């Protein structure tokens, strides 16, 4: 199973309609679009998927739709993390029911939980996942939970944990984790340092911008596999030019707007309180969509 979890995994966006409801048809198109561009797998219901502005029922619905569209074609990882252990367990059970390959959970956040409470939280989710491997999700910039290296080492050695999504710019820590855990599946989480993350020991990555240019990240993997560091650097630079624009527009709404211009997502809106993209960026995003479509073809 560990080998199946390696690779380039798109952190799937969740499309909504003008009434802020789940757009299931756009979601299905987005899943197919990711499969067509050669993604190894999907990370469903995470930060990029706006999970924390959805109800548990909506998150279950997203898992079900994605499984219907992609099960057996690519690797599927369900992010089931919530502040509540019970809510996370409910989603983990759903992931098992729908045939996902693994579950993942962000560290419980908002309240100042003790580290032992974090460990108990993961143990309970792993139990509810009924044999599915766990991907621990470390994202200190958003969760506010700043794990020490020793704490990370403890979490990734809990029974049932197979992987770590390391969304941190600390490449030294990435290398330390790899050195300490040679068999752990280790994902780079920040797209802008994907190539550097691989060189620091990551097996692959989970990222939001893979939704619109996954083939570039696959190209970086292939270039490094062949020892062509210069090519990997060039591809990373091209990815980062896109990321520069998305940071200006707001990453999730910018991605949805690009996918709208690619005829994948019907409505380029995130759920409130996220606002729409500022209209001044629309020409640049439209040009980017056209460029990427031509490149993909």
UniProtKB/Swiss-Prot annotation:
EC number, UniProt record: 4.1.3.3
Residues annotated as binding aceneuramate: 47-48, 167, 189, 191-192, 208
GO MF, any single term: N-acetylneuraminate lyase activity
Keywords in alphabetical order: Carbohydrate metabolism, Cytoplasm, Lyase, Schiff base
Pathway in which this enzyme or protein is active: Amino-sugar metabolism; N-acetylneuraminate degradation; D-fructose 6-phosphate from N-acetylneuraminate: step 1/5
One GO term of the biological process aspect: carbohydrate metabolic process
Nuclease in keyword set: no
SMART domains: DHDPS
Annotated Gene Ontology cellular component terms: cytosol
Location(s), subcellular: Cytoplasm
Function: Catalyzes the reversible aldol cleavage of N-acetylneuraminic acid (sialic acid; Neu5Ac) to form pyruvate and N-acetylmannosamine (ManNAc) via a Schiff base intermediate.
Quaternary structure and interacting proteins, as annotated: Homotetramer.
Name under which the protein is recorded: N-acetylneuraminate lyase
Organism classification: Bacteria, Pseudomonadati, Pseudomonadota, Gammaproteobacteria, Enterobacterales
Name of encoding gene: nanA
